[in-house]
């Protein structure tokens, strides 16, 4: 059975995007909200270790609009070049009934997302991941949460309050008990907390 993790940047008040989908808060360190080099490397290493990433439409559109060619942009840093390569190479599944085509080592699923995630989880191989920097996967992850398919939650909490937007945790049908397995701090007051689902 493959492990499924939901990992995202989140505000201190629990949102993955501010109203209107605004992500200007999500980096956490500099005045431009860019992530620290240490945090960016953590996300890059996570992408490199992911056996399969699962994306909803919004996440796919955000990631595929930047990372496929980010390493060719003027001024791209070595870390951005490495992340772009890792992201292109990482196997991905996009769940959408409105997207017509996907590229970059990606497969499109238009049917029942929960059934397909359960099927993928039942296989063997590397860990499955909800998607690094998953800015639009709240709906997909929420469905997987309600179906009891998520094994681990990794919250990268940025010390900012946005007052509303897209919540990290959607409405659940029942309680989910978790066990803390890791905490780590990054520059700018960003805190990683990882929890495993108690089964």
What are these regions (language model features)?
Residues 1-199:
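Enzymes that bind and transform nitrogen-containing heteroaromatic metabolites
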